[in-house]
Each structure stands twice: as structure tokens, then as C-alpha cells.
Amino acid sequence: MIGFALWPLVALASISPLQTSAASASTETLNYAAIAARIIDALKLREGERVLIRYDPEYFNELIGPLRRQIRARGAIDLGALEYVESAAIRDTTSAGEAKRAALFEAQSRAFAQLLEAVEVYLWLPLRAGWRELPAAESHALQRWLDQGGARRQIHFHWSAGSVLADGLAGEHVAAFDSVYQEALDIDYAALSTAQDRAITLLRSGTVRVRTPMGTDLSFRTGNRPFNKQNGEASPERAQVAVVRLDREIELPAGVLRVAPLEETVNGRIVIPTARFGDKVARQLKLEINRGRVVRLAADENLDAVEAALNTGGEAARRFRELGIGFNPRLHTTSHTALLPYYGYGAGVIRLSLGDNRELGGTVAGDFVRWFFFPDATVEVDGRILVREGKLVDGAR
């Protein structure tokens, strides 16, 4: 699709065998039937629920058939599988004038919203970055759809897109992570949820302090802010009692616990050894935070790139966003790569971030979000240790 025509939203294609591309060659040995079973089990589909799948025809195509068969076997309605939009088609619209782009955005959003009216469950399957993507207008429509409540819910199954470096930006996914991710789907989910519940109790009980060997020393309180448990449950019952939008967006592999602290209680500093900003790398980046706001920046190299990025991001870019703590015991890092598995969901990995946190129940609004990961942090609450140097302590597992 080129020019300014709408994406083919009604072309819910039947699946036919497609050749595996080089991008998916490393996934040839995966057990797609078992992966599909894990996804469907997480959903706890009710009879008659309507399911829409989004996919890249040249990446994880082997998963589509087993998914659709298992959807039907549960008595749910397989509405079909819709391809992600080609990135080149989206780029073709960037040369249009502002008014034309705005009109296209609204038209796309309305059309996709109409499609979603017939859906209870939306499945995000992996895609190849730079080749396929979800248009911003459709992402906007999905958010509004989720916010209508009820049993509406999504499974996010991003796979290679979750392979990130500690600066929060994507790294180059390695084949070894495919087996790591598959193993990380096969965990004790009840034990995971119990460990997250224990952590919530501790994190609510006092002042949280996060420290790293490189100099991060940040404290805050969570108060009565909602915690988002990525515990692998995407049932309609959970969706019905969702407190924040992220409670309806369930990630597989599972494992992270997320919260937006009370913004005015966040004080201290975050030290980031290296972070990419555009085509530059900032080194020894230090963020001084007072009452949830970044009040001072320093870096050994390329501070100008950091300043430019935060200025472009607006007010939200200088506001603290969230704490995330990983709990999945099988999303382990390796000595062979600096990559972190699946968005830092591995046990003991800490996420600190800046930007809009409304989807977590916070008060920071804007269009900016930037994550930073710390695989060697210590987290304590009034002296009681939850994570010590990147390892969950006994009793926190």
C-alpha cells in the first residue's frame, strides 16, 4: 500500500504456508505448538470470544496455524490474522503536509476502531523492525479500545524486539535468546505471582531505595499506587478488574512488576554508564532528581545529545516515570552478550525510567518514555533487602 490510501484493514487473510525468511531462520527449532498453547492458556478464552491476530508474514509465521487451531478448539471465534503494515508504506506518508497527515491519522484510527468493535482479544505477534510495524493511528485506536473496559485484553508477544541493551534501546537479537525465551515461557506461574505479591507488600511498607555500584542512589514511596503484575495471566476475569491499562496488556514471557511511585517523593540520582541518544553515546550520564523532576544533568561525553533529546521530549522527559523489577528465573543474562533478555524481565533486573506514566496510574503526561536497566542494582525498603546486586533475595523469589 502506497500513497495516502488506508491500510487494508478488512483483508483478514487466511493463512497459507510462507517461506521462512533469513530474519526468522534462528526460530526454526522452536516448538510452535507449545508456544501457541502457552498463549491460549494465558488467555483463558471463553466460548464465543472473538480473537484478532496481528503478524509479520515472514517472522513467526509458523505460529499462526497452531494459534488459530487452538483458538477454535476453545470454542472462541477466530476472526483471522491481519498483517502488520509495511514500514515502507508508512514512510511514504511522511512527505505529506501536516493537514494531510492529520487527516490520514484520523481516518486510519476510525477505521481500525471500527474493526476492533468486533474483538475481545488482540494478539501482538513478533515483527521485524524496519520491515513491518503498527501505525501510530492504529496504536492510538488500540489504547482507546482497551480503555473501554470489560473483557478487552491483549497478549504482547514481541520476542526479538524485547532484546535490549541497558540503555533501554534495542540491541541485535541473538539466536541463543530464542531458546532462553522459550524456556522462560515454561515457569511456575503461581510461584511467580506469589513472589510478586510479597514484593508488593514490602514495597508499600516504607521508603524504597535503589542503589548501583556506579552511583545510582534513588529513593521514593509507592503509597497506594497500583502495581502492574506481569504474571502471565490474561484471563477475562483479570481484565474485568483491571485498575490500569497495563493490566490488560499481558506480556509473554512474563515476569516484571511495575509501579509509578508518588512523583513528589522521588529524590536522588540515577547514573547510567552508557546511553545512546541519536547517533551519539553519552557516557557516565548522571540525572539528579528532586521531587520527581530532573533538575540537573551531567555526563563525561555527549551531554549535548542528552539535552537535545530531553528538550525534544518536553516536560515529561524530565519527570521520573516508574520502577520495574524482574522476576522471571529463566530470563537470565549471559556472559557472551551485553543484551538483556525480554525488556529486563529477568529475576533481579531493575528498570528506572523517565516520561509519561499515566498507563501505570501516575500523573505525568506527555509523549516521551525512556527506559534504563540496571542488572546489578540493590533494592531495599527501610533496610529490608528485596534485590541484592542484581539477585532476588531468598523469600523474594
Residue ranges of predicted features:
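Active-site bordering "gate/hinge" segments
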Residues: 15, 21-267, 277, 389, ...
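Short acidic-glycine loop/turn motifs at beta-strand connectors
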Residues: 214-215, 224, 289-293, 298, ...
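Charged, compositionally biased interaction regions
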Residues: 27-37, 190-192, 199, 203-208, ...
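Structural beta-strand/beta-sheet cores of well-ordered domains, especially the beta-sheet scaffolds
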Residues: 206-208, 216-218, 255, 266-270, ...
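Bacterial N-terminal signal peptides
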Residues: 1-17
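Short, solvent-exposed amphipathic alpha-helical segments in soluble enzyme
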Residues: 67-73, 139-140, 226-227, 286-288, ...
